[in-house]
UniProtKB/Swiss-Prot annotation:
Coiled coil: none annotated. It comes from the Bacteria. It comes from Shewanella sp. (strain MR-7). Belongs to the UPF0235 family. NCBIfam families: DUF167 family protein, PRK05090.1. This is UPF0235 protein Shewmr7_1261.
Length: 96
């Protein structure tokens, strides 16, 4: 599976998460996954909540349109973004 897939207007992201980073950013490819660094620690769902908020802001969608399909408790996640209004340049290049 590739890191980024457009499927029926939704975006599927195969992510590798780096919690407790110095800043929030989309790092780039990490094998077959897209590496995303976030500042939140992986405690009590804080990293997942922060990831959802960060992705919602990056794709200009409400947090309710960001769904973690797989990997709630791990670093490897499959995330669906429903009808993104914006696609960051780092991800747009992977779609082509």
């Amino acid at each position: 599976m590739s890191a980024v897939i457009m499927q029926q207007g939704d975006l599927l992201l195969n992510l590798y998460i780096q919690p407790k980073a110095s800043r929030d950013q989309i790092v780039g490819l990490h094998g077959d996954e897209l590496k995303v660094a976030i500042t939140a620690p992986p405690i009590d769902g804080k990293a997942n909540a922060h990831l959802s908020k960060y992705l919602a802001k990056a794709f200009k969608v409400p947090k309710s349109d960001v769904h973690i399909l797989k990997g709630e408790l791990g670093r490897h996640k499959l995330v669906r973004i429903s009808a993104p209004k914006n696609v960051p340049a780092e991800i747009a290049t992977l779609l082509e």
